[in-house]
Amino acid sequence: MADQQEKDQKLKKQQRSNATIAFACLSFFVCMIGAAYASVPLYRIFCQVTGYGGTTQRVEQYSDTILDKTIKVRFDANTANGLAWDFKPVQREVTVRIGETTMIKYEARNLFDQPTYGRASFNVAPGRAGAYFNKVECFCFTDTTLQPGEDMEMPVVFFVDPEIVNDPDLKDVKTITLSYTFFPIEKPKPVANVKAETPTNGS
């Protein structure tokens, strides 16, 4: 009888130990998922600031320096599943002087019989060149709405930072590719029109 009780106690201890380990593993797994979701916006901000991962830079002023050296810029266009748009660059490539401000255009057409809404993501290849690819104006800064059958021209104003010539990892780069992908989004919610209350006399 004593041996049986001892075995039962050992079994209960083993079960409690297994339950503790399982709970610890589950907690770790949940924490890792939470950390992964939290890291997405932080990673996006990091990429936008540093150009890491081919994320281009947004600027509000033009380059003061234009070099004699030129570089070829190619343009790529894609649409994700669920967005019936014909989206493409007007020009497939241009050759520009480094530091020179250039405007090119994409065009999009809604092939659906209802209004559709899209948001563009973008990147540059090679990835390291994203830190030197500066966009002054871009349709990707805002969401886009296309009515049924509507065509829209979408300008992009950019320049390649002259500092790119001082980057030893990019000294042999002759071509940069700017790529956009449009994703479907839900219809934007209307902004509530709140009327300001005017005070009445005596209030």
From Swiss-Prot:
PANTHER family: CYTOCHROME C OXIDASE ASSEMBLY PROTEIN COX11, MITOCHONDRIAL-RELATED, CYTOCHROME C OXIDASE ASSEMBLY PROTEIN COX11-RELATED. Exerts its effect at some terminal stage of cytochrome c oxidase synthesis, probably by being involved in the insertion of the copper B into subunit I. It comes from the Bacteria. Gene3D superfamilies: Ctag/Cox11. This is Cytochrome c oxidase assembly protein CtaG. It comes from Brucella anthropi (strain ATCC 49188 / DSM 6882 / CCUG 24695 / JCM 21032 / LMG 3331 / NBRC 15819 / NCTC 12168 / Alc 37). The chain crosses the membrane at residues 17-39. Its main location: membrane.
